[in-house]
Swiss-Prot record:
Involved in inositol deacylation of GPI-anchored proteins which plays important roles in the quality control and ER-associated degradation of GPI-anchored proteins. The lineage of its organism: Eukaryota, Fungi, Dikarya, Ascomycota, Pezizomycotina. GO terms for cellular component: endoplasmic reticulum membrane. One of its GO terms (molecular function) is phosphatidylinositol deacylase activity. The active site is at residue 310. Keywords: Endoplasmic reticulum, Glycoprotein, Hydrolase, Membrane, Protein transport, Transmembrane, Transmembrane helix, Transport. Glycans are attached at residues 23, 74, 865, 873, 1011. Belongs to the GPI inositol-deacylase family. SUPFAM superfamilies: alpha/beta-Hydrolases (SSF53474). It comes from Chaetomium globosum (strain ATCC 6205 / CBS 148.51 / DSM 1962 / NBRC 6347 / NRRL 1970). This is GPI inositol-deacylase.
Length: 1147
């Protein structure tokens, strides 16, 4: 028998109607409109001061005036404690129970106290408040601006020329499972260039190429082909090179079946283990006369040269820490676009730990005081970065400044390398023609087959690499001319007018105008002269080496005292310019050709430092620069015009004061960003001027440089302005030819990158060098301004990984707000409503706290790091290489705005992501409704009775078996990421079912359960990207028929809480409210999750899964406490509830 109140006979709408017996049309729009008539009538009677009607209605109501029992999400009746207290914030007729639950209390039915019954408002999950909408639009707008800037502004020009080759590969089948357990998965090949290499015998120096993440063994072909052609066409005909120990290179390459090493640490270790055995096998080939064709007088090779691309460079460094590493088998490593400083992504715990082990080993090795204690003393490491065009791995991560001292390695950008002068993307660095030529020639230059290591000593190797990869203008550049022997005997007439007056500039607009060989002698100022003199020379003509017969040669000469009957046969080259005069002077001269610096040609017709396929080849400028102390032992600089016919070409040479050509602008970064910086080069200026701006260090900012036009007073310009921007460390230079405007960006101090072994001085910053025509007697005005729109694009590469962490910061705060409201009012509000509430208080307070935290750590950092700069060998055991790992990866107060900026972007992303999830669940719900079959002969009433149940709880045994099988698979065969993906799919289906019930049978309980499952689904989706990479690696291993069980990620505890929680939600159980202090546990867990995601999430993203897993563990426990909070409630997780489920209303 039904129980009715005098005010209304409608039952509580908060109690869900049972799905199996639900009448979906009962709550249709039509019925809800008709049920509104009694309320309207009551209101009308009340306004007319007439007694209300006491007639009893059989229709359902929104409120049951006495509700001794409440129902959960599946309709199960839950007994509630009887003690009650009135809630001050509850509406009339609502009371708060002892455990914090809102209930209705019985109201005395008198004509004066009759209150019309109203249905609780339906809270649509699609609804969004104006403030949340504005925040989402601002966030998405800023994200679009960042993406648009990254593809349209501050872009480096693409200048790679195409390369060609004729490759062939010989598989070394004898390297099988007898040598390594991984031989069934990986393969070793020997590269051979067709038409050049006649067989597969090894006869040269072994070089091992290691492909990168998902790379192919065939990527070795551009560099290997260039090496084969260069030796065949040039080196084998160079007797001096052959005598110096140069031989051809035998390139070995490894087929890793395109393994994904960036996402899986164990794969990285497996490759390193395999390669160590491969190196041992490769070295053994040179001992086997059947496959080796070498001079028996040469020593057997004991080491290989390693060339690594991308993650292959990390694998190369990992080889040296593996137990099966053969000592001294690797002493030269060249890497291209390899992320040495930190992992490209931090989704895998083993990857992060492997990186830490590798980097700690290298730092510890180079921190040893004595060479005998350093296992890496003979190892050189050169890291080559592609620059701004590399959008796969941030080039900031290629830095090795925090790993090796400059005596053993360095980082250089391709835009710095002479005759390359262009940025490259992640793949182009392998096939770029001008770059591969430099790499091949540099390797040949360090080869010496007369040594067992097959390479020159470490110091000589470093000297060679600096010569090939650096500009030659760095402070560490070594000048070769002062250390060489005199090679040229120059004889000049004493009465010649070829001596330039001291202090004057030599300017030649054309060569060979005298019709004979002519020498211009420039006196060298004495060492220690005031002004710190330096000599500079610029020409568009190639400088001759001793014995060559070109157009121009530069010599440093000393007067030879006249002695009777002295022999001059010791000079390989002699030039007599005395014309038979009796009064002549002989000079012993050294050639400056070894120290020539190549600069990109800058004329009125050039646009880029490089030329492309099909374009006319551009001859670079030749530049010399010496401090007076470097050439103080000589008396003259001789500029010799060797051509006797008029030839186009210019020469500008001068001695200038260092103080006139160098200046430092001490301007704060804030002032520069606000007002810009202006300076001018005076009319009477040196040919080369340099301006250093110490405040320009951040890689997050971009600038625009503008140079005014110079007036040459009618004379033709010798050359157009040439600008070089450069950093001292890492070695990054960019050239701008025919410069009028230039876009300036750099790879300096970058987020999340460890500090260098030797702390950077405050004076280190971006520098600009200007080569301008000094014959143009007009000043040049230069302006440097910040490019704010261009700077937005720099955030993309540096902060794209924040989307693995900061959205969880937002989601955790929203979930926390939803639970707090639910425990207080009994309403589990939708996700967007929770987001709106968080935007009003929680998120701003949290962002303010995080900003203050970053500011405080930035203030304390300098004092704690002061000891970094005083270390005996360049590093320190107390140096904190992880202090940039937190929050936004930088302690610069200028970038504190990035914290709220990233948060507002994540608010927009979370909003869009939420709507995408809503769309997905609704579409799946519609599809599920369409596939539901209802025969046409079934009437409407019967069709309502046949509505399928939303939640059928399987038997406890079946649920336990399913869970046990899944966990058993995790323990033995599949990674736990697979189980997590299954859990996400199950949760999606649960959310779809909850959405169908909530939309068809609108009630508070159904709405609560749907909003709860939807929010849990959103949380799991944001955790999913952290788990997907490992799952992809596992699928890839299956695809390559590698059936060995996955050797990592089998911890069932890492996924069991999620499985239990998702299984519980499939039964339709709503999480119970907690009115005691235990509700603060959920709040603290979600608060801690939000803080952890913001502070540590970017660097340790893999830990976010564990944090969310612990939250799922707690929620599963709360689910087990449906009746009371006790451990006995745990049995409810897998107990059948069909017996206690009510099919309709209680009689």
């Amino acid at each position: 028998m039904r129980r009715h109140s005098s005010g209304s006979s409608e039952d509580d709408d908060a109690s869900p109607v049972e799905a199996p017996h639900a009448n979906s049309s009962r709550f249709s729009a039509k019925d809800s409109r008709s049920s509104a008539h009694p309320t309207t009538k009551l209101d009308h009677n009340r306004n007319a001061d007439r007694p209300p009607s006491f007639s009893i209605s059989r229709r359902s109501s929104s409120i049951n005036w006495r509700l001794p029992e409440s129902r959960n999400g599946n309709g199960t009746v839950e007994k509630r404690p009887s003690p009650e207290r009135t809630s001050p914030s509850s509406p009339l007729g609502l009371i708060m129970t002892a455990n914090g639950e809102l209930r209705t209390k019985e109201v005395e039915k008198t004509p004066e106290t009759v209150i019309p019954a109203r249905r609780p408002p339906w809270r649509s999950p699609w609804a969004i408040t104006f403030s949340a909408l504005v925040a989402a639009i601002v966030g998405i707008g800023f994200l679009v601006a960042v993406l648009h800037s990254s593809v349209t502004r501050q872009l480096d020009p693409k200048g790679c020329r195409m390369s060609y080759m004729r490759p062939s590969y010989a598989k070394l089948n004898e390297f099988d499972t007898e040598h390594t357990r991984l031989a069934s998965k990986y393969s070793l090949y020997l590269y051979r260039e067709q038409d050049i290499d006649r067989d597969t015998k090894v006869r040269g120096v072994p070089v091992l190429f290691i492909p990168g993440n998902a790379g192919s063994y065939k990527q070795v072909r551009p560099i290997a082909a260039e090496a084969a052609n260069y030796f065949h066409n040039v080196l084998q005909h160079d007797e001096s090179a052959m005598n110096a120990g140069t031989r051809n290179l035998d390139f070995f390459t490894v087929d890793f079946n395109e393994d994904i090493t960036a996402f899986h640490g164990q794969t990285l270790l497996d490759q390193a283990e395999y390669l160590n055995e491969a190196v041992r096998y490769i070295l053994s080939l040179y001992l086997d006369p059947r496959v080796a064709d070498r001079d028996p007088d040469l020593p057997d090779p004991t080491s290989v040269i390693v060339l690594g691309h991308s993650m292959g460079g990390i694998v190369a460094r990992t080889m040296l820490i593996m137990p099966n590493f053969q000592s001294h088998s690797i002493n030269t490593i060249i890497t291209m676009s390899a992320p040495h400083a930190r992992p490209p992504v931090s989704f895998d715990s083993q990857s992060v730990q492997t990186y830490k082990d590798i980097n700690d080993y290298w730092r510890r090795a180079y921190s040893q005081q004595w060479a005998n204690d350093n296992p890496l003393w003979h190892v050189t490491l050169v890291s080559i970065a592609g620059g701004g065009l590399d959008t796969v791995v941030p080039s900031d991560y290629a830095s090795v400044e925090s790993l090796v001292p400059d005596t053993h390695g360095f980082t250089v950008f391709t835009s710095t390398i002479p005759n390359v002068w262009t940025s490259m993307d992640h793949q182009a660095i392998l096939w770029c023609d001008q770059f591969r030529k430099v790499v091949a020639q540099a390797i040949y230059d360090v080869v010496d087959v007369h040594r067992a290591t097959q390479t020159k000593p470490r110091a000589e190797r470093m000297r060679v690499f600096k010569k090939w990869f650096l500009t030659g203008m760095e402070t560490i550049a070594e000048k070769a001319a002062p250390r060489s022997e005199p090679t040229t005997l120059l004889t000049v007439d004493d009465n010649s007018d070829s001596i330039i007056a001291e202090g004057e500039r030599l300017v030649l607009r054309n060569l060979g105008t005298a019709g004979t060989v002519r020498a211009h002698l420039m006196p060298i100022p004495p060492s220690g002269s005031p002004g710190m003199k330096r000599f500079t020379l610029l020409t568009d003509t190639k400088l001759d080496k001793p014995g060559e017969h070109g157009k121009l040669e530069v010599l440093f000469c000393s007067v030879i005292p006249s002695q009777p009957s002295q022999s001059w046969a010791g000079f390989p080259s002699q030039m007599d310019l005395s014309k038979g005069s009796t009064g002549s002077t002989r000079l012993a001269c050294r050639s400056a050709a070894p120290d020539v610096v190549s600069l990109p040609a800058s004329t009125s017709s050039t646009q880029f430092p490089f030329y492309l396929n099909g374009e006319k080849e551009i001859t670079p400028f030749s530049y010399l620069e010496y401090g007076v102390d470097d050439i103080a032992e000589h008396q003259f600089v001789a500029v010799v015009e060797k051509t006797t016919a008029p030839t186009p070409g210019f020469v500008v040479a001068e001695f200038s004061d260092y103080t006139q050509s160098h200046r430092t602008r001490h301007i704060s970064l804030r002032s520069l960003l606000t007002f810009g910086m202006k300076f001018h080069l005076p009319a009477e200026r040196p040919m080369v001027s340099e301006v250093k701006v110490p405040s320009l260090q951040s890689s997050l900012l971009a600038y625009n440089l503008r140079i005014s036009h110079q007036d040459c007073n009618g004379d033709s310009e010798l050359f157009a302005p040439l600008v070089r921007q450069y950093l001292a460390e890492p070695y990054e230079s960019k050239y701008f030819v025919n410069a009028r405007e230039a876009t300036v960006s750099l790879h300096g101090v970058a987020p999340y990158v460890p500090p260098p072994l030797t702390g950077k001085l405050d004076e280190n910053g971006l520098s600009f060098q200007f080569w301008t025509d000094p014959t143009c007697s007009s000043s040049i005005h230069i302006e440097l301004t910040a490019d704010f729109m261009g700077s937005l694009g720099k955030l993309y590469m540096r902060y794209r990984t924040v989307f693995a962490a900061f959205p969880l910061f937002i989601v955790a705060l929203v979930l926390r707000k939803q639970f707090r409201v639910y425990d207080t009012t009994g309403m589990f509000i939708p996700f967007l409503e929770g987001l709106d509430l968080c935007l009003r208080q929680s998120i701003p307070l949290m962002l303010a706290s995080l900003t203050l935290l970053t500011l405080s750590t930035g203030i304390m950092a300098p004092a704690s790091n002061a000891s970094f700069w005083h270390w005996r060998n360049g590093t320190s055991s107390i140096m904190d290489f992880q202090h940039n790992d937190l929050l936004i990866g930088t302690e610069d107060p200028l970038f504190l705005f990035l914290i709220p900026l990233i948060a507002i972007v994540c608010v927009g992303v979370c909003t869009v992501f939420n709507y995408m999830a809503l769309t997905l669940t609704h579409l799946l719900g519609v599809l599920a409704s369409l596939v539901t079959f209802h025969p046409g002969w079934i009437g409407n009433e019967d069709r309502k009775k046949t509505t399928p149940a939303a939640f059928f709880s399987p038997s406890p045994r079946r649920r336990m078996i399913t869970t046990a099988v899944l966990l058993l698979l995790v323990t033995t065969m599949v990674p736990y990421q697979f189980a997590y993906l299954v859990a996400c799919l199950v949760q999606l289906m649960t959310t779809v079912r909850a959405q169908r019930i909530a939309s068809e049978l609108r009630s508070t309980a159904n709405s609560n359960f749907y909003n709860y499952t939807h929010s849990i689904f959103i949380l799991m989706l944001w955790i999913l990207p952290i788990n997907l990479p490992t799952f992809v690696v596992w699928v890839h291993n299956l695809a390559v028929h590698w059936l060995t069980p996955f050797s990592s990620h089998h911890n069932v505890l890492s996924v069991m809480p999620f499985i239990v929680l998702v299984e519980t939600l499939t039964t339709g159980k709503m999480i119970p409210r907690m009115g005691s202090r235990l509700k603060h546990v959920t709040s603290l867990l979600l608060f801690g999750m939000a803080v952890y995601a913001a502070v540590y999430g970017v660097t340790y993203a893999y830990t976010l899964h564990y944090v969310a897993n612990f939250l799922a563990f707690w929620l599963a426990i709360v689910h087990s406490t449906s009746d009371s909070w006790s451990l006995a409630g745990l049995t409810h997780l897998y107990s059948g509830d069909a017996g206690i489920r009510k099919r309709g209303k209680e009689p």
